[in-house]
Design a protein with these regions (language model features):
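Short glycine-/aliphatic-rich beta-strand segments at the starts of folded cytosolic domains
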Residues: 1-16
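Intrinsically disordered, low-complexity mixed-charge segments
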Residues: 2, 6, 70, 88-96, ...
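Short amphipathic alpha-helix segments
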Residues: 13-30
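Compact, well-ordered interaction domains used in eukaryotic information-processing assemblies
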Residues: 26, 32-41
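Interdomain "pre-motor" coupling segment immediately N-terminal to P-loop NTPase/helicase cores
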Residues: 37-96
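Conserved helicase motor core of SF1/SF2 NTP-dependent helicases
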Residues: 42, 106-114, 118-232, 236-320
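Conserved adenine-nucleotide phosphate-binding loops and their immediately adjacent elements
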Residues: 96-108
Length: 320
């Protein structure tokens, strides 16, 4: 049986590559048919030539993440293993080498699936990109990473993050407190993504300067946004009028990403989703990309993927 031994600086580095968890090595054997043992500063692989090649590149990818300062937890191991098994070594290399740098003090962000990589490439190539699909596919997170990277590289002069405050019917004037207090609950997911990728003091500084703006969709009306990276999140809860208003805000040197889940519409019955209409009307317009995610792109808890699959099957049977 073919074998190959991978050598590392010390035992700690070798064990970090599988998060000090023997069950991850067990998963490797179950998924690739490769037995992996680790002692001191090495990992020994035993199995078929193809399996060893895939396993070797799995560890090369994880080591690259470690060197970049990114953690290797059970979920990172599982994502990389899933890619190298189903998509192959070449795709794993593509994902590893495409690290989006958001700040000098942060390790950066990489796509975890082939679908996510396609999404990043679409954002790079198009001025308007739609990311449509179920929760947990990284639509918003990756868009925020691309926005911060564009700001860092001087490609844009500001970032604008927005989403409909549909729970309040956009009637924020009727809520108690100042504007910041009113909008914070609706915009928290966008702020969470920012804090993952940029130190808090930098976020505050950029917010005070107006370089980063987080605001409800209603506050976009009447503006022309030049040299900006604009993200509309939860776009399924924008009305058709709001979506058209948002899309026509785009000015010179700007890029927009619109994300949403067409199965999670919270609008009143008399309102139509702007995302559904835009998806249908704009998908073949030159300069606009529409990326459709599937349950295979879910990168949350493994159960989330199975939950989405179960609901899809249930809804399909109801239609029949």
């Amino acid at each position: 049986m073919p074998t190959e031994t991978l050598h590392y600086e010390n035992a700690r580095v070798a064990q970090q590559l599988f998060n000090h968890e023997p069950r991850n090595l067990q998963s490797l054997e179950e998924q690739l048919g490769v037995k992996a043992t680790s002692r001191e500063g090495w990992i020994k692989l035993e199995g078929s030539a193809d399996g060893i090649e895939r396993a070797k590149h799995l560890f090369i990818s994880l080591e690259s993440s470690l060197k970049a300062g990114a953690p290797v937890r059970n979920r990172e191991f599982a994502h990389a293993l899933n890619v190298v098994k189903h998509e192959g070594v070449a795709m794993l290399k593509d994902l590893t080498n495409d690290r989006i740098l958001t700040h000098d003090r942060k390790p950066g962000v990489t796509a975890k699936t082939a679908g996510q990589k396609k999404y990043l490439d679409a954002i790079r190539k198009h001025d308007i990109t739609f990311g449509v699909g179920p929760a947990g596919t990284g639509k918003t997170y990756l868009a925020v990473a691309m926005a911060l990277s564009a700001l860092r590289e001087g490609k844009v002069s500001r970032i604008i993050l927005t989403r409909p405050a549909v729970e309040a019917g956009e009637a924020l004037g009727f809520l108690p407190g100042d504007l910041y207090e009113k909008i914070t609950p609706y915009l928290r997911p966008l702020q969470d993504a920012l804090h993952d990728m940029m130190p808090a003091e930098e976020i505050q500084k950029n917010t005070e300067r107006g370089t980063i703006e987080v605001a409800p969709l209603a506050y976009m009306r009447g503006r022309t946004l030049n040299n900006a990276f604009i993200i509309l999140d939860e776009a399924q809860n924008s009305t058709t009028e709001q979506m058209l208003m948002f899309l026509t805000r785009l000015g010179h040197g700007s890029k927009a990403v619109i994300t949403g889940d067409e199965t999670q519409i919270d609008l009143p019955p008399n309102k139509h989703s702007g995302l559904l209409e835009a998806h249908r009307v704009l998908q073949h317009v030159e300069g606009i990309a529409v990326m459709e995610f599937s349950k295979r792109d879910v990168v949350r808890h493994p159960l989330v993927q199975r939950i989405i699959a179960a609901y899809e099957e249930h809804r399909g049977s109801k239609k029949d």
